[in-house]
Amino acid sequence: MTDPSHRPTVLVVDDNEDLLELIAESLRKLAPYSVVTASDGAQGLERYFEVHPDCVVIDVKMPGLDGYQLMKALRGDANSRSTPLVILSAMAQPKDQLAGFLSGADEYLLKPIGPLELVKVIATVIGRSEVERCRRQQALLGELSQQDGGDEG
């Protein structure tokens, strides 16, 4: 069961400081989210492992570690593999979107986007993630109870 007092944490990674603050402020005002920001991919990776967010919103084009590389790093780590990743990018070509999904994105959104639309997508991917987490826990409990039952006798 999810703790009703838990405020989901969203990590927003974008090298455009003005846009980063606008997104963070919109998420704080429109939804019950705790928001953490990072201004490049390397800092995003570092912040991810500091706060273990419930969702990560990622720009693609950033200096150094870009959004695709950040997603691949997160998907390659067992602790972050199931965290929802949402790309927020101005790159609108189908090949860009395909590259995003192949890198591990759960959603690919185009800039500019309205704040309410962004909140809706984040809420949806966090909800999906919670459902999947509960399913995994139930399956594990089922396996454990079968093991306990098999040892008796």
Question: Each predicted region: which residue ranges?
Answer:
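CheY-like receiver
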Residues: 2, 129-153
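Two-component/phosphorelay signaling modules centered on CheY-like receiver
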Residues: 17-36
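Acidic, metal-coordinating helix/loop segments flanking the phosphotransfer/catalytic sites
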Residues: 37-55
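Receiver (REC) domain active-site loop signature in two-component systems and cognate sites
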Residues: 62
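C-terminal output helix
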Residues: 113-123, 134
